[in-house]
Structure formats: structure tokens, C-alpha cells
Amino acid sequence: MMQDVSSSPVSPADDSLSNSEEEPDRQQPPSGKRGGRKRRSSSRRSAGGGAGPGGAASGGVGGGDEPGSPAQGKRGKKSAGCGGGGGGGAGGGSSSGGGSPQSYEELQTQRVMANVRERQRTQSLNEAFAALRKIIPTLPSDKLSKIQTLKLAARYIDFLYQVLQSDELDSKMASCSYVAHERLSYAFSVWRMEGAWSMSASH
């Protein structure tokens, strides 16, 4: 029996059966790996599909911010239009600035002419009051303003009218204008100091 077992060779059929049994066992792990890969890929696809609407929505929202989107193009055109309007406003300002020096020069000329006329008027008025003060008898203590000078001139005219109506002046004295003027000046000063000027203020 020992000889039969040891001497009996293994048949090729038995080898093929053993090989065929071993091959499925070897082939099963790769199939399991492939199934795992397929499951992983399907799970990834399902996850991608679930996130697809959200991604599409986010893509839709972000699409408005893309530089190539139509809304962005319209905004760019509007901003360009506003920039053009600003440029036009700047151009208008430059044109108005070009015309401003002429108006400024005209205003300066008008001011200069007005100042010259005012100086001439003031000078002529001062000369007239200086001449009037030479005619009106005044006291050394008089510091008369222009209004007071005019009032004193009116009172002096009233005094002269009263003197002409009286017969106090002698014909000889009247012939000498210088002496007459001195006497009138003295009489007018006395008249002022006696208060006759204040009494005749109602005239």
C-alpha cells in the first residue's frame, strides 16, 4: 500500500481541478476590490449629485460676480457712462473757468471806477465845507462836524437877514465890507453865546 500511494502519480485532471479551485479563490479579492471601487465611485457620484443643486445655485450666484457675465457688462457700461459724464462736467468747469477771469476783471474795473468816483465826491465835499467854514464866523472852541457846520450856516443866514432889516449899521460902515464882515462876525458870535441861536432853532 505504501508503494501504491508513493508510486501513484498525481493525475493531470486532479491538478486541473485543484488549480481551478484555487483560481476562484484568487480572483475573488480583486472582484471585491472592484466592487468596493464601484461602490465608492457611486457614493461619490451620489454625493456629487446631492451637492449638485447647491453647487449650481452657488454657481448661479457667483456667476453674477464673474467678469464675463452680462450683468457685469451692463454695470461696466453704466460706470463708463458715469465716468464720461464726470469728464463732461470737468470740461464744463474748465470752460467756465476760462470765462471767469473776464468777469473778475470787469468786477475789478467797476470797483476801481466806483472808488475813484467816491474819492472825487469826498474831495469836492470837503473843499465845499472848508470854504463854508471860512465864511461862517466860528469860535476858537468850535469843532464842528459837517452837519453842525450846515446848521450854523443856516443860523448865520438868518442872523444876516435880521441885521439887514435893522438900522443898526451906519452907511459909512456898510461901505467898508471888511469892517462890516468883522462886526457881523462879532455880533454873530455874541448872538450865539447869548443863546439866541438856541432860541431861533425853531425857525
UniProtKB/Swiss-Prot annotation:
Its main location: nucleus. Residues 34-43 have a biased composition (Basic residues). The keyword DNA-binding applies. Residues 162-192 are annotated as: Sufficient for transactivation activity. This is Twist-related protein 1. It comes from Pongo pygmaeus (Bornean orangutan). Residues 1-18 have a biased composition (Low complexity). One of its GO terms (molecular function) is DNA-binding transcription factor activity, RNA polymerase II-specific. Residues 1-106 are annotated as: Disordered. Efficient DNA binding requires dimerization with another bHLH protein. Homodimer or heterodimer with E proteins such as TCF3. ID1 binds preferentially to TCF3 but does not interact efficiently with TWIST1 so ID1 levels control the amount of TCF3 available to dimerize with TWIST and thus determine the type of dimer formed. Keywords: Activator, Biological rhythms, Developmental protein, Differentiation, DNA-binding, Myogenesis, Nucleus, Repressor, Transcription, Transcription regulation. One of its GO terms (cellular component) is nucleus. It is found in: Nucleus. Acts as a transcriptional regulator. Inhibits myogenesis by sequestrating E proteins, inhibiting trans-activation by MEF2, and inhibiting DNA-binding by MYOD1 through physical interaction. This interaction probably involves the basic domains of both proteins. Also represses expression of pro-inflammatory cytokines such as TNFA and IL1B. Regulates cranial suture patterning and fusion. Activates transcription as a heterodimer with E proteins. Regulates gene expression differentially, depending on dimer composition. Residues 47-66, 81-100 have a biased composition (Gly residues). Pfam families: HLH. GO terms for biological process: cell differentiation; muscle organ development; negative regulation of DNA-templated transcription; rhythmic process. PANTHER family: BASIC HELIX-LOOP-HELIX TRANSCRIPTION FACTOR, TWIST, TWIST-RELATED PROTEIN 1. Signal peptide: none annotated. Residues 109-160 form the bHLH domain.
